[in-house]
Every structure is written in structure tokens, then in C-alpha cells.
């Protein structure tokens, strides 16, 4: 589940005001318990998106911090400075929206650090109180029976001058504390890292005493470079690089997700790979957002179901855990005109009925509209229609996943 916590929803719920509750528009803790119970009854596991790096600027911690005296423990819950050039080597991630990682606060009379949007101030993990609070959040949801956490933006927890402020040793120390909390429950709980880093920098998150799995975003970029160039050279290199992992740990292999297809500034993959993708996928300038391409899988592949099958056949057969973004099994499209990354976050197309069967709400109450773009209209591209067509993309995915379950060699 992407963030379900109370939030002003300025960034899709990743701007959190209370880590131990449910957004009132979604229900309450009792409703969450019912959902968890129903999922477990169907042998489904529920993983929560846990945003460790930052809060909303409306979180009570930040509101107290900005009024607290400079240098006080309450102020130091966040990262403050008099100098907005500090940590100058840390790239601005949301470069379409932010010109700096620092924002001036009139009340505090200091700058606060934010690796994400300016309304998402970074927590200060140098402060032991912050670590204790966030470990308490882990405990809270473990006690409620969740089956794991997708640890959002884990490389950014600590800062150091002269570095990119990513994947520092202190970050790994804290993640080992998280692992210890999980192990103490004696339950089978998954810790999954979102770390958009090269393979050699992402692999340390998979140490035996750290996390169980991590997304391999470098492999994703190389897959698209192979499609764009018609050559598997970069893909072979990336696969070789990803071979050695700690026992029991796994790469998670996504083709797309709810963000832009992240390519980066030449750090995740080389500038040559980035240029290959830019040239070969023929995406217009308007589809570029921050450091990547803001399209869903099907439009990236020009609506070609054969390319969809080839790429998914790869991630279903490679060592690791395939990650299927909802709708990609149908060839769902996107809404490029929507704000920020909302283009990739439209409702799932279940049926040809109103709003794709996702909701019967009137249009003004929908957070995002269903797809009606030519070639991707939800009245044509949906689960109900494709279930009835033996040769549909959906049924192809079902057959492939059945093969994966039956053949142990495909489950390494």
C-alpha cells in the first residue's frame, strides 16, 4: 500500500502528519485491521510504504521545531542551517519544482533541508530521539500484523559534507536497527529498499543483517536501453554486476512504478545509456520530469504488446522477484496532462463500466480520472474484456506467472 497515513496530500501521501494512524478519507485503524484480516484470509500479504526520510511541514514535530530555540533538541528533530550552500554535492531530486535542497523558514529564521519537495522537511537522524521515534513507528505497525515495509528513499537518511548525501555508513547502521526490530518479532516480515542507486551502491542494503530485498533500478534502465538500441550489451553487463548477493536476499525487478522512469544525472547509469534511451524511445520533451521519463510502460513502448511480453518474460525469468505495476498486465495507458507523476497513477481499469469499475463516485469526487485516451480507453482496455480473450495480454501474463510458479528454476 502506498502511504495511507494522515496527510495534506501535497505529494500523494508521502507528506505525512501522523505515522501511526490512517488518513480519515480512507477509514481508521479498525478499517485497516479488517482489510488486513481479509487479505490474510485470502493468503495475501500486506506491505506498507514507510517514509523514513521526511515528514510534512504540517507535522506537529516540524511545527514545534520551527518555534523551538535554535540548537534545542526540539529544533534538531530536523536539519537546519544558516548556510543554504551546505551539502552542495547533494543533487536536487525534484529539479522541475525545486531550485535548492534548502528552504528558508520565517519563524525559525533558518534554512531547513529537504531532499524532496519544500513541504517535506528531512528528519535529522543524527538526533537519537528521531531514530527512537521512527523505530517506534516500525514497532507500531508490526504489532498490528503487517507483513513488511517498502522503505521509501532509504539512501537519504543522513547527510555529510562533500558527499551526495546518499547511502552513508550511518544509514546502514540505522537500517540494521530496523532489521533487529523485525527479527525480534519472530515473524516473516519483508524489508524492501527503494534505493535508486547503481548496483554496487544498492547491493550493501542486502547485507545479511540489513534488508531482505531492494529494487534494481539500474537493471530497469538497462532494459530500456536494450529496447531503445536493439543491443543487449549494457543489459549483459548489469546482469553480471548483480549476481553476488547475501544469502536469502533478493533483487526486486520493476519495469515501471508510480514515479517517473528514473534515469538520473549520470550516477545511476552512464550518460551514454541515458542518451540511448532518450533517442530510442522517442518521447517528447514534455514527457520528461525531474531526472526521468514520466510515462507508463505501454506508451513508452508505443503501445506494442510484443515489447511488453518480451520485457516481462525477462523479469519473470531473471533471478529475483518480479514487480508488476498495476495495469501493466493490461497495457494500460497514462494521462500526460495531469500534475507531476499523477499521469502514472490513474484508476485501475477493471470493467467497461463507469470509472472503469474502480468507483461509482461522480467525476468531481474522483482524485484522478480513468484513462480515455485513444488506444488506451478504459472501456476497451480493462480486466473484464481481456479475461474473455485467450490471446489477450492479461491472459499471457497469467500463463507466464503460472509457469513461474510451476518451474523452480524460474523462482531463484
Name these PLM-found stretches:
Residues 1-412:
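Active-site and adjacent substrate-binding regions of carbohydrate-active enzymes
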Amino acid at each position: 500500500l502506498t502511504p495511507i497515513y494522515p496527510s495534506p496530500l501535497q505529494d500523494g501521501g508521502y507528506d505525512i502528519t501522523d505515522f501511526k494512524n490512517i488518513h480519515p478519507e480512507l477509514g481508521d485503524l479498525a478499517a485497516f485491521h479488517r482489510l488486513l484480516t481479509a487479505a490474510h484470509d485470502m493468503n495475501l500479504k500486506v506491505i506498507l510504504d514507510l517514509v523514513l526520510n521526511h515528514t510534512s511541514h504540517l507535522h506537529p514535530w516540524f511545527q514545534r521545531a520551527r518555534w523551538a530555540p535554535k540548537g534545542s533538541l526540539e529544533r534538531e528533530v530536523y536539519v537546519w542551517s544558516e548556510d543554504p550552500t551546505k551539502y552542495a554535492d547533494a543533487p536536487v531530486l525534484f529539479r522541475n519544482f525545486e531550485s535548492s535542497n534548502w528552504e528558508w523558514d520565517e519563524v525559525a529564521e533558518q534554512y531547513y533541508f529537504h531532499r524532496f519537495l519544500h513541504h517535506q522537511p528531512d528528519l535529522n537522524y543524527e538526533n537519537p530521539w528521531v531514530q527512537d521515534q521512527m523505530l517506534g513507528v516500525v514497532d507500531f505497525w508490526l504489532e498490528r500484523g503487517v507483513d513488511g515495509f517498502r522503505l521509501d528513499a532509504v539512501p537519504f537518511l543522513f547527510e555529510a559534507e562533500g558527499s551526495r548525501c546518499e547511502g552513508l555508513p550511518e544509514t546502514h547502521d540505522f537500517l540494521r536497527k530496523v532489521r533487529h526490530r523485525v527479527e525480534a518479532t519472530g515473524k516473516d516480515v519483508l524489508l524492501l529498499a527503494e534505493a535508486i542507486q547503481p548496483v554496487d551502491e544498492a547491493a550493501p542494503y542486502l547485507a545479511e543483517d540489513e534488508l531482505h530485498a531492494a529494487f534494481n533500478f539500474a537493471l530497469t534502465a538497462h532494459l530500456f536501453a536494450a529496447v531503445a538500441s536493439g543491443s543487449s550489451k549494457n543489459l549483459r553487463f548489469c546482469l553480471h554486476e548483480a549476481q553476488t548477493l547475501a544469502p536469502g536476499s533478493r533483487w526486486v525487478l520493476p519495469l515501471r512504478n508510480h514515479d517517473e522512469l528514473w534515469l538520473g544525472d549520470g550516477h545511476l547509469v552512464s550518460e551514454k545509456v541515458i542518451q540511448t534511451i532518450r533517442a530510442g524511445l522517442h518521447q517528447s520533451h514534455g514527457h520528461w520530469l525531474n531526472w526521468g521519463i514520466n510515462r507508463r510502460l505501454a506508451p513508452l513502448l508505443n503501445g506494442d504488446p510484443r515489447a511488453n511480453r518480451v520485457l516481462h518474460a525477462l523479469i519473470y525469468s531473471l533471478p529475483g522477484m518480479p514487480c508488476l505495476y498495476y495495469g501493466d498486465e493490461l497495457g494500460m495507458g497514462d494521462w500526460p496532462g495531469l500534475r507531476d507523476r499523477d499521469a502514472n497513477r490513474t484508476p485501475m481499469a477493471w470493467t467497461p463500466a463507469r470509472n472503469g469499475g474502480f468507483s461509482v463516485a461522480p467525476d468531481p469526487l474522483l482524485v484522478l480520472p480513468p484513462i480515455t485516451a485513444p488506444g488506451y480507453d478504459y472501456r476497451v482496455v480493462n480486466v473484464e474484456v481481456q479475461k474473455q480473450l485467450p490471446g489477450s495480454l492479461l491472459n499471457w501474463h497469467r500463463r507466464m506467472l503460472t509457469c513461474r510458479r510451476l518451474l523452480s528454476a524460474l523462482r531463484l
